[in-house]
């Protein structure tokens, strides 16, 4: 009997030791997992975002959105591209949260509010937001299934190249933080730039979505590197666009609840919705200058840039539609990039060819600008670049495009209708 009791006691002791070892192992395992998760969290991340669980298991379940999934928010909604995005979404029946800096600025928002009175299936609601303020988009993004980020507070005209670069990161980080806090966003489509794509190549080289501005460093004589960001605005702007693209893709991958897709437009032209869209130094602005009889690159008899260039043109309405299709298409995935440029060679013109086309489309305008000519030929040879086409957007997103003739004609007609010529 005593031996039996001793065996029972021995078995219980062994069991307790086993349980203690198992508990110690489980505790160590969870501690290791916790430490691993903490190491992945980015420095300076908001406290409320630190505790938010990653859902990478959702990655295979993510697909495009539809209007039944909820509203779509548009940043930079009053801008040239953003306004067309809002219009396109409303045509498709979406409820749009239009984010603008000042909802009381009638000059910038009236054309948006007028969309509510055009019999479109969708609707629009304005939200006041500022890219440079943390949390400014939280309210606008609540309940949204998609975000189309067209807003940009910085460009070439900041005081220093470093401000261009740093500012681009700051504003995009604020927007991404609001996306994560919303918790309902499936697709985040944002306007990048062809500047994030282009780099020195031989004349006639055709750029694709596989190209990045940091490629072919030797072609820049080693200048186009991150070490030179603080010294050159062009480098700062292009590298900011490329590196924020990569930052956004990484943020979406780590979060696991939404996918990020970029649209990289080249020379965007097309009809203006408001005279506010005649933005100084924009491509549509220079079309207006040509129609006023000024050679390309000139403004009020001042030469702002060289008059020779290969124009690679895309309609602003096609750019807008590509943003919306990026939120919907099952073919687009996190990290997908889509160049929005000419559909084919017809949309690529040297300045003198563009002048000839405008003369054909607007015979009533006596003097149309172009570039300096000698005996009917361009005085200077133009470097044959950038060549690129929106083939991938057509193939994967199902984008259909305007003809270059329709785009140019309707651009000029809008300038006339708005009394800008």
What are these regions (language model features)?
Residues 83, 103-170:
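NAD(P)H-binding glycine-rich loop region in Rossmannoid oxidoreductase-like domains
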Residues 192, 244-272:
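Conserved beta-loop-beta element that borders a ligand/cofactor-binding pocket
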Residues 288-338:
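Alpha-helical substrate-binding/gating segment
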